[in-house]
A protein has these predicted regions:
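Glycine-rich phosphate/pyrophosphate-binding loop regions near the starts of catalytic domains
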Residues: 1-98, 103, 115, 185-186, ...
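Active-site-proximal betaalpha loop/short-helix elements
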Residues: 35, 119-189
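General beta-strand structural signal in soluble alpha/beta enzymes
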Residues: 57-61, 76, 96-98, 141-145, ...
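Short, compositionally biased
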Residues: 107-122
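Acidic, Ser/Thr/Pro-rich beta/coil linker or hinge segments at domain junctions
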Residues: 211-257
Length: 257
């Protein structure tokens, strides 16, 4: 429905993945399938625009212009000196959400696009915060907020780290006009959840605020296997990955190539 945006997102989500791990993107490769070359022009334009914006070159890939329909796959290479993992959140940590609210929803999707029309230098500087925080030893674990939204991404972090998380819905900051329920499932173009030691919360939040990015502590990390949502005096169970795995991480030891 929006091939330019699909191409842009192919780059954007990959550079966000690298930032979420405390790294800096180096290069991108892509695979494009289309019925004909002209069918892929708008898609490729979106990729080129994002590549130029984030200054991450597309160095190669594969094209098939004899395919049944338009499809895209993108991979990214990056480097990090201090990793942010999904596996190191611990009981006692605080969950922080950092999101760029300077945007709007793209068409009828749940994609909150804060990169459209934004200065490229600002977007690159915002992403640079993640490796800087990691190299400063201020972030223990984290993930970029994906298509599963804030709650689903927090669930993935909890399961990866074998911890419980309770999210305070009243603490979640939202863009002007955004309702809570759709915001919880939204996929922001810049959004991260981070596990941070209590003593480091103020320092981490201030780094984002210095760049006019919304950031706040939204939850607590404890022992267990659940994700709870609370508002006021009410707390409800959202998911228990011990009884119903979300990612189904049966083994952290690779069993095949």
């Amino acid at each position: 429905d929006d091939p330019w945006f699909a191409g842009w997102c192919g780059v954007m989500v990959n550079v966000s993945d690298i930032a979420a791990m405390g790294g800096r993107p180096v290069a991108i490769v892509d695979q494009v399938w289309a019925p004909a070359a002209e069918c892929a022009e708008v898609l490729m334009s979106g990729m080129r625009d994002a590549s130029e914006c984030y200054q991450v070159p597309i160095v190669g890939g594969h094209t098939n212009y004899d395919a049944f329909e338009l499809n895209l796959a993108v991979s990214v290479f990056g480097r990090a000196t201090a990793l942010i993992t999904s596996f190191d959140a611990e009981p006692g940590d605080v969950l922080i959400a950092a999101v760029d609210h300077r945007g709007s929803y793209r068409n009828s999707f749940d994609n909150f696009f804060a990169a459209g029309g934004a200065p490229a230098e600002r977007l690159r500087g915002d992403l640079e915060l993640l490796p800087e925080l990691s190299e400063a030893g201020l972030v223990k674990a984290g993930k970029d907020i994906s298509q599963s939204g804030i709650v689903g991404t927090a669930l993935m972090l909890a399961e990866c780290s074998s911890v419980s998380i309770t999210i305070d819905l009243d603490a979640i900051e939202r863009p002007d006009g955004a309702l809570l329920e759709p915001w919880l499932r939204s996929f922001p173009s810049f959004g991260f959840i981070l596990a941070v030691k209590p003593d480091d919360v103020a320092a981490v939040v201030s780094r984002f605020h210095d760049r006019n990015l919304a950031a706040s502590a939204i939850g607590d990390i404890t022992e267990g296997s659940t994700l709870h949502l609370k508002s006021g005096d009410e707390t409800v169970l959202f998911w228990d990955y011990a009884s119903q795995p979300y990612l189904n991480l049966q083994s952290r030891v690779p069993t095949h190539a």
